[in-house]
Amino acid sequence: MRTGASFEVISPHDPAGDQPAAINELERRIRAGERDVVLLGATGTGKSATTAWLIERLQRPTLVMAPNKTLAAQLANELREMLPHNAVEYFVSYYDYYQPEAYIAQTDTYIEKDSSINDDVERLRHSATSALLSRRDVVVVASVSCIYGLGTPQSYLDRSVELQVGTDVPRDGLLRLLVDVQYTRNDLSFTRGSFRVRGDTVEIIPSYEDLAVRIEFFGDGIEALYYLHPLTGDVVRQVDSLRIFPATHYVAGPERMAQAISTIEEELAERLAELEGHGKLLEAHRLRMRTNYDIEMMRQVGFCSGIENYSRHIDGRPAGSAPATLLDYFPEDFLLVIDESHVTVPQIGGMYEGDISRKRNLVEFGFRLPSAVDNRPLQWEEFADRIGQTVYLSATPGPYELSQSGGEFVEQVIRPTGLVDPKVVVKPTKGQIDDLIGEIRQRAEVDQRVLVTTLTKKMAEDLTDYLLEMGIRVRYLHSEVDTLRRVELLRQLRLGEYDVLVGINLLREGLDLPEVSLVAILDADKEGFLRSARSLIQTIGRAARNVSGEVHMYADKITDSMKEAIDETERRRAKQVAYNEANGIDPQPLRKKIADILDQVYREADDTEAAESVPIGGSGRNSSRGRRAQGEPGRAVSAGVFEGRDTSTMPRAELADLIKDLTSQMMVAARDLQFELAARFRDEIADLKKELRGMDAAGLN
């Protein structure tokens, strides 16, 4: 039975610009029963905020799909801030590193599955599924990972352990139940997914929680239930009932597992006869050894490595049928929002083929049973069957979503800040580098930044070297730059440590750089993916967050793609200017905190201290997981000021404690992949340490 509060947006701002009309029209179309609705939202118009207000209007559980983990995290963060009293969850692949199992027949090379799982992301995945099965006020922000196989929601719910004060549950019986759903007993190291026993007290850290659960028995009855801090043991709150969901999504009861083992053995016998009949004795031997080992593991402990390859048997599905996915955890009336749909929709359609081609080899050469191919992502048709009403968000909607909506779309091009789309200027290629250098110097003098996009890696490298020779502060962003370094480069650009960023594909959706006033597109007339109309519009959008934003296209002719991009930009710009004039709006520069570019999902650990301060019987943590209180992004130092106090007047001991506190926050941010935030803490700590050394040198305390 799903419970939960109503969706409620908490924001210091009201809808503005095109937002009110867009929200009303989206709501009207969805309530009228339209299955597919497109929101054409220009860069910087507040599509995420529009989504939050739409969810509040419709009061329906919502899945928001984003094209990658970074944008999913950014979206989740924004929605958490606007929906602080609801469950905004984050569901992406939990692998930090993943090498899938594969066999290369040409070289007779078997590559064993190798992966590194991020425990925090795994917890957030469990948090999403447990929230979906227990409440309705849920928004899940997910990557394309949500179309991959997951255990069935019915098994996940059926195998959960419900606890209530006053009920009779023998302690040893509870321990057996916990082991059955893959919790491990560990009285020495208390970690997520484990439990420990101390006399009549059992303590568990559920797979989806940062807090532990304490169950106190009196005889065979449950006397009390508490949430507590797993490290200190301090009680956070007392509850009357709770539900412990399984530690893995692939879980089955003893009867279901026995049936699965029986059908696996039947399939194994059939496949071995087939392989041996074709003289493939080596393949048959491989398959027999591996499968029998896995069966024995499942028989003894209810689990085995790679159990997902047997998911068809465990779920009791027929051959060729689609697996259960995150979509199956939603109620039937859920709303789907696809962000950056021009990128995300093709991703969804392409996942199945890449997966099936790899698994065919594994089956053919005896590494897996044929049923392993049924542990797979959804095909496009299967995905379409599982979704209901869908809202597509994009500045450049793709052909699929436009065809689904009959070519109609809701438009959101007027920004709440009054900012207008940049001017587009076409310049000849002759003397383009000298012209570019002049433009760069003009902007560097007034503390503005420049993005330059080229067509090839060689051209980007040569241009970067030449600009350096000319005394320009420039950096080069390319595909080999890792995530941490990429975020650091963007941060340095915004801080003014250099003035120009050169790259090949700088149209990155979500690249949010308000300081950039010029985007230079070299070889704009060379038709291709990087110079298509859609790509050009996305690239133009990178200059749309600056009052004096301009785009310079260097080309000797105007291609059809250029004309389409320029015409669309001019159309939007004319509408924006007319709106500003009619309403007396003066465009305001976007002031976005530099630490906010790529802030990732806040973890539950962020508010554990605040939760601990709530007395037993109090309201405890906010019901929505992983959320800081509104307007409390964590303590930070800014220009020598901390929480309103001048750090130069702080006592030495207090300053040392502050450094220790910020160091701890830096480590948490780095662990959670909040690299920009971690770098900001690092710089602040360095400044404070200088101040501390100065105090020591002066003999001050």
Swiss-Prot record:
Residues 656-691 form the UVR domain. The keyword Magnesium does not apply. A motif (Beta-hairpin) lies at residues 94-117. Residues 606-636 are annotated as: Disordered. Residues 28-188 form the Helicase ATP-binding domain. ATP binds at G41, A42, T43, G44, T45, G46, K47, S48. Its main location: cytoplasm. GO terms for biological process: nucleotide-excision repair; SOS response. Residues 432-598 form the Helicase C-terminal domain. Keywords: ATP-binding, Cytoplasm, DNA damage, DNA excision, DNA repair, Excision nuclease, Helicase, Hydrolase, Nucleotide-binding, SOS response. It is found in: Cytoplasm. Belongs to the UvrB family. The UvrABC repair system catalyzes the recognition and processing of DNA lesions. A damage recognition complex composed of 2 UvrA and 2 UvrB subunits scans DNA for abnormalities. Upon binding of the UvrA(2)B(2) complex to a putative damaged site, the DNA wraps around one UvrB monomer. DNA wrap is dependent on ATP binding by UvrB and probably causes local melting of the DNA helix, facilitating insertion of UvrB beta-hairpin between the DNA strands. Then UvrB probes one DNA strand for the presence of a lesion. Forms a heterotetramer with UvrA during the search for lesions. Interacts with UvrC in an incision complex. This is UvrABC system protein B. It comes from Mycobacterium ulcerans (strain Agy99). The gene is uvrB.
